[in-house]
Amino acid sequence: MSNMQQKTDVILIGAGIMSATLGSLLKELAPEWEIKVFEKLASAGEESSNEWNNAGTGHSALCELNYTSEKSDGSIDIGKAVKVNEQFQLSRQFWAYLVKSKLIRNPQDFIMPLPHMSLVQGEKNVEFLKNRFEALSKNPLFQGMEFSDAPETLKKWLPLIMEGRTSNEPMAATKIDSGTDVNFGALTRMLFDYLKTKNVELNYKHSVENIKRTKNGLWEVKVHDMNSGKIEHHTAKFVFIGGGGGSLPLLQKTGIPESKHIGGFPVSGLFMVCKNQKVVEQHHAKVYGKAKVGAPPMSVPHLDTRYIDNKKALLFGPFAGFSPKFLKTGSNLDLIGSVKPNNVLTMLAAGVKEMGLTKYLIQQVMLSHEKRMEELREFIPNAKSEDWDIVVAGQRVQVIKDTDAGGKGTLQFGTEVVSAADGSIAALLGASPGASTAVHVMLEVLEKCFPSRMVEWEEKIKEMIPSYGISLTENPRLFQDLHTSTGRTLGLNEKETVHN
């Protein structure tokens, strides 16, 4: 089949949560469109979406302190927290639609109810958390949140963390029962199983080597079939690059103006995993702390109950590492290969600006097991070294670009869509909040790339995602109704309390 041209409507590159979500949306909105998926690895959801390669938090800003910043007057800016929460609600609604429509089954295999908690130490941090709690409590999306700085309450909420604690330093926590643990690997595999039934062509062990524009305005994707060794050429009207850290090099190959002056900085993550089941059973929450002064946002420490392979697990981290690879299964030449004449100055400017991050990563890489245990003991004073192993999580490629606010070579910490002016190709770059906001981000892809179709699609989108285009903050009754109905469908309600 070498050099044979094969035409299709849509090509999705990468079999992760983003392509799975976009493919599922398109199959509901335009069922007649032909879709092909190309994935370098042997199965779906094996890179960033894999359950061991991300924190599995349903990011809705219930406990993540980096989404609420303190202003100079001491008040709390909750804008980003509200935005992230609203975006997660879209994911929750779409997943509930898929379950209710019997397109995917057994929601407990990918989402579980789990309290989300924030925990801080020190007088100043306690005051910050109280102010945060008061600011968020006024918003309907965060109702049901509790605050306590009483040691007896904290012992009830956090028995493992409070046991053996000798310091008299003030502590406080917030707790909300409507949090979730999401197994994005399992969800990705379910979505691709569904897409297979809709005649989506899934090609595993197929590596995309090049993407170029044809004379008639289509995109030609050069694919290496790693099973047969043959080279294939596929053309499509629309291409989505959802290859995690591998998206940037592929975007650069397209040559679109929007791909210029963008760089990527890879950061690897490590987690400690508890192998003593007795310890695992003593904790039931995702508990997020506060990043240390000067540390980057991705360094927020958290102690998480996880549900992986139908078993309860306990993970602590993340610890950062450095590897020049853009994917866990990538090449050591990824970083240097991504430096181009059009982004070299952007990359160099970031290098000068981000000396603090570089120093932080070097320190993290040098940590011994015992040094990591010392950080864990700030959460679990009685933690024993022999009970904990280290696991290497996924690679995250932080976007570097020139911005008006930050100037040349500014490091970005979010998720962003880069698309051609004519909407014929789009790529997803960046890291957190990532998978949790997959539905919002893929709706953004549809809006950018298929603007002429949005009016015709709107009714179906609202059937799948009722709050699409609506602020739930401004419609508390709708939020209440949707939260209850999606919770019932996804099997979350028995542990959740959302107050009127």
Curated annotation (Swiss-Prot):
Molecular function terms, GO-annotated: 2-hydroxyglutarate dehydrogenase activity; L-malate dehydrogenase (quinone) activity
Domain of life from the UniProt record: Bacteria
Enzyme Commission designation: 1.1.5.4
Similarity comment: Belongs to the MQO family.
Pathway the protein takes part in: Carbohydrate metabolism; tricarboxylic acid cycle; oxaloacetate from (S)-malate (quinone route): step 1/1
InterPro entries in UniProt: FAD/NAD-bd_sf, MQO
Protein name per the record: Probable malate:quinone oxidoreductase
Major enzyme class: oxidoreductase
An example Gene Ontology biological process: tricarboxylic acid cycle
Keywords for the protein's UniProt record, in alphabetical order: FAD, Flavoprotein, Oxidoreductase, Tricarboxylic acid cycle
Reactions catalysed according to its record: (S)-malate + a quinone = a quinol + oxaloacetate
Necessary cofactors: FAD
Record Pfam families: Mqo
Biological classification of the source: Bacteria, Bacillati, Bacillota, Bacilli, Bacillales
